UniProtKB/Swiss-Prot annotation:
It is found in: Nucleus. It comes from Zea mays. SMART domains: ELK, HOX. InterPro entries: ELK_dom, HD, Homeodomain-like_sf, KN_HD, TALE_homeobox. The keyword DNA-binding applies. Expressed in all tissues examined. Highest expression in leaves. Its main location: nucleus. This is Homeobox protein knotted-1-like 2. Pfam families: ELK, Homeobox_KN.
């Protein structure tokens, strides 16, 4: 009986640790784009730094190149302009 209880406790802790690890990995991924995706967007940004507003065609091409959703592309540019662009 004692061995069974010990085994159940170990299994319970093991399962809980797996759940915690998965949650941490999920949270870490949120908000960060993969490096190659970010570099594609940054390259477009640098090439169009005077007026960083992609056309619908530009956005469609970036969706194809990066695999991101259109909403993610739009949000990236909104955030990038807020953080890094000063229209002088």
């Amino acid at each position: 009986v004692r061995q069974e209880l010990k085994h159940e406790l170990k299994q319970g802790y093991r399962d809980k640790l797996v759940d915690i690890r998965e949650e941490i990995l999920r949270k870490r991924r949120a908000g960060k784009l993969p490096g190659d995706t970010a570099s594609t967007l940054k390259a477009w940004w640098q090439a169009h730094s005077k007026w960083p507003y992609p056309t619908e065609e530009d956005k469609a091409r970036l969706v194809q190149e990066t695999g991101l959703q259109l909403k993610q592309i739009n949000n990236w540019f909104i955030n990038q302009r807020k953080r890094n662009w000063h229209n002088n």
